[in-house]
Amino acid sequence: MTDSQTETHLSLILSDTAFPLSSFSYSYGLESYLSHQQVRDVNAFFNFLPLSLNSVLHTNLPTVKAAWESPQQYSEIEDFFESTQTCTIAQKVSTMQGKSLLNIWTKSLSFFVTSTDVFKYLDEYERRVRSKKALGHFPVVWGVVCRALGLSLERTCYLFLLGHAKSICSAAVRLDVLTSFQYVSTLAHPQTESLLRDSSQLALNMQLEDTAQSWYTLDLWQGRHSLLYSRIFNS
């Protein structure tokens, strides 16, 4: 495990809005959700955000935790995660972001990490994804990469949720629902901080078998995204 200063340094890098995960291309169902509301305003967004975070907690965080705890089982964990996905759009987004993170690992991060068993598992995983023998789902890759970097499980879960919250808020700005100032105040708000902290704590006690969709209509909105007459995002 890395020391606290190094963990903080890596956390700031991983949570940077310029971190090249292509998150700006996805609204994670927000665009479709807003398009199906009678009133497309900030109140609709604030209804969406906590429900979306809770969905990610229950659909993704058990996999993040399992991948961090047992990186050598990345293939089995990925197969399980794939089997639980109920929305093809969400599946596509997950694999695209996972592949992006694997590229970041290979081209930017791996040079600064001492070779360990986790390092070897991750390199093997990357080769399998490149040869199309694995899918590279984002929560699996995230868990293994954070373990290779020496981040704690709690920090790994928190950063995953924070990244999702930032992506949703950023999408809301581009959709002209939030101003740039509201983007900052939303993320800095004590309720958002409490939601992220409490959710990451819940994730620590989750098992793969706890994976479930807590907000079923989110899958419907994401599934209808390609049917929107006009759209900015890919999901």
From Swiss-Prot:
Compartmental location: Cytoplasm; Nucleus
Coiled coil: none
Alphabetized InterPro entries for the sequence: UreF (IPR002639), UreF_sf (IPR038277)
Molecular functions per Gene Ontology: nickel cation binding
One Pfam family linked to the record: UreF
GO terms classed as biological process: urea metabolic process
Keywords annotated in UniProt: Chaperone, Cytoplasm, Nickel insertion, Nucleus
GO cellular component, one term: cytoplasm
Homology family: Belongs to the UreF family.
Role: Probably facilitates nickel incorporation.
Protein known as: Uncharacterized urease accessory protein UreF-like
Record lineage: Eukaryota, Fungi, Dikarya, Ascomycota, Taphrinomycotina
